Amino acid sequence: MPARALLPRRMGHRTLASTPALWASIPCPRSELRLDLVLPSGQSFRWREQSPAHWSGVLADQVWTLTQTEEQLHCTVYRGDKSQASRPTPDELEAVRKYFQLDVTLAQLYHHWGSVDSHFQEVAQKFQGVRLLRQDPIECLFSFICSSNNNIARITGMVERLCQAFGPRLIQLDDVTYHGFPSLQALAGPEVEAHLRKLGLGYRARYVSASARAILEEQGGLAWLQQLRESSYEEAHKALCILPGVGTKVADCICLMALDKPQAVPVDVHMWHIAQRDYSWHPTTSQAKGPSPQTNKELGNFFRSLWGPYAGWAQAVLFSADLRQSRHAQEPPAKRRKGSKGPEG
């Protein structure tokens, strides 16, 4: 009887405990980065907690799992060929450092914000380690076009379906298939809008395909978007607002999270309520009941004058705290008592 061919074993998500030889670490205390506060907080929509305190997602067209101990950020990268399984290289780790902008020292920023803002000082005691990701401009732009009138869970689903439909397949881990983010060319195709509507993007489908075409046909392609990193905040914000589906809030998100504009302060209903509730701020136009282009600029200027050139980072701390407290209030009491700090160390 002929021997049965052995099927290749499917690659699975790793944990630090199960495969320590395939991980590398970056010195980074929790006070400088809290993965559980940063990755699910509405900056990027592509990270999942696949195992307790182990976050898996796509960064620079590679699939990673990240976890942390008290003083270290631990990283493992998955390559398509199992024979190439090895710990991340120094160049690969540098991509992680840049993604989390670890050259920016949070402790100094928190100290400054706390010294000028007593409310921030109070909130920050429980929400150390909130920092801004430096995302790919294309991924950030189209993710936040999907964010219009939406919540984090629904945006996450839309972005995932967008990547599955138009992004390159990278690797399968357990029963999860990971895709890279689609290119401008892939999103500019003639059938894209109709396909995205079938995937549940609604009116945002038109904005996705129209913005991709506008960048390619009217603005000069990817280089135009990337060079906005060198422009002033005001110039970059104005340029982004030309694109279909990009208003003041979405433009501020892209400026802050992809274009190196730490002073950008995205204003949504959360920040509007925080400003009124905790800072007694009111727009000069007393009739204004919520965010608008004019009031967004006014509130952004208020926070910039209070917090300084990294105002967008300070805003992210308050936003994450408000988001976490809202989720906590909605959880059943039994779940609230559970936590996933991650591996000890």
Swiss-Prot record:
Record's compositionally biased regions (Basic residues): 335-345
A single MF term (Gene Ontology): endonuclease activity
CDD domains tied to this protein: ENDO3c (cd00056)
Result of changing residue 131 to Q: Found in a lung cancer sample; loss of activity
Keywords in alphabetical order: DNA damage, DNA repair, Glycosidase, Hydrolase, Lyase, Mitochondrion, Multifunctional enzyme, Nucleus
Top-level taxon: Eukaryota
Function, as annotated: DNA repair enzyme that incises DNA at 8-oxoG residues. Excises 7,8-dihydro-8-oxoguanine and 2,6-diamino-4-hydroxy-5-N-methylformamidopyrimidine (FAPY) from damaged DNA. Has a beta-lyase activity that nicks DNA 3' to the lesion.
Pathological condition linked to this protein in its record: Renal cell carcinoma: Renal cell carcinoma is a heterogeneous group of sporadic or hereditary carcinoma derived from cells of the proximal renal tubular epithelium. It is subclassified into clear cell renal carcinoma (non-papillary carcinoma), papillary renal cell carcinoma, chromophobe renal cell carcinoma, collecting duct carcinoma with medullary carcinoma of the kidney, and unclassified renal cell carcinoma. Clear cell renal cell carcinoma is the most common subtype.
PANTHER family: 8-OXOGUANINE DNA GLYCOSYLASE (PTHR10242), N-GLYCOSYLASE_DNA LYASE (PTHR10242:SF2)
Protein name (record): N-glycosylase/DNA lyase
